[in-house]
Amino acid sequence: MDEYPVQIGSMLFTMVDPNPGFEIAYNRWYERDHFYAGCMIGPWLFAGGRWVAPRPLKDLRFPAKSPFAEPVDAGSYLSTYWIHKDHVEEHLEWAGEQVVWLYANGRGFNERTHAHTSIYDLVSVKYADDDGVPLELSLDHHFPGLGVLVTEPAEGVSAADHLAWLETNAVPGLLATTGISNWSAWTKHPAPADRESQSPMKLGTDGGQEDRLVQLVFIEADPTTTWDAFRAYGETVDDGGVARLTFAAPFFGTNVGTDDYTDQL
């Protein structure tokens, strides 16, 4: 696949639940204000997308307990954003100041709970089709489905060996599945010790081991039609002895501008 100058360096991954009774209000606040004012207008952030997991999708998550989401069905909404390569710190400096300003000016939303929010750095991307939708465009392509996977290396397994084993032994089966477009792997971006104190609210779990790999799988179909492949992926990982799968979750793309799914969480 041809490369172009606009390249992803990092991702903001934020998985959140509206508090009961505030589902519509949260959805409207986020997509009509915070999606833009808290993220998209910031420097070097060039794409964003929102995803939702109604109850039938939450029921497909595995394993039953996860250090990434506690409980495993936490996180009804997921937002993912691309930050340009070599400019993540510039964006994060702006974002820290911006969220303080927004809350100080009455533009926060306290009736929500973070399941897991963090910054991740891109380390690998693989495609089902050599001329498929580039990862840089995958949020703007509006895929109908997204799968999130998290794996942790076994004791003594290096980050490089963990990634290489997945790419060789587990990823090909996913990419051979009809509807799956691309797979990407991300490592946790180093965070300042006072990161939590800079946020107006707790940011959810620590995600598990520091050396985990968060993986995004963009799906050109209803994600439930591909979920057997995700289960097979998990079995391959857990049986391989090199890593363990700690979280697998499907999402639909949100129907922007509507209250769809707010009554199904």
Question: Which residue ranges define each predicted feature?
Answer:
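Macromolecular interaction modules
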Residues: 1-265
